[in-house]
Amino acid sequence: MDISKMDRYAAPVHFSSLPLLATVLCGVGLLLLAAFTMLQVTSTKYNRNVFKELFIAATSSIFLGFGSVFLLLWVGIYV
């Protein structure tokens, strides 16, 4: 296996778009986290909807997770 004949690896996301992706994904995740917190504080135990809570929490978790990955890539920690 000759390394010089292999194709060079190209990242699926261009490095110049990492700051925008990190900022947008973390921002959306934090907004959903705030919405989830407001939902928990303002609802009583009689009008809570567990599916709505799980949907908002899972969506926020996904956005914050991907935002954290892009943030780490942006600062040079290649995970």
From Swiss-Prot:
Major localization listed first in the record, in broad terms: membrane
Membrane topology of the entry: Multi-pass membrane protein
GO molecular-function term, one example from the UniProt record: oligosaccharyltransferase complex binding
Keyword Transmembrane among UniProt keywords: yes
Annotated pathway: Protein modification; protein glycosylation
Localization terms from the record: Membrane
Pfam families, A to Z: Ost5 (PF05251)
Subunit structure: Component of the oligosaccharyltransferase (OST) complex.
Protein's UniProt name: Dolichyl-diphosphooligosaccharide--protein glycosyltransferase subunit TMEM258
Species whose genome carries this gene: Caenorhabditis briggsae
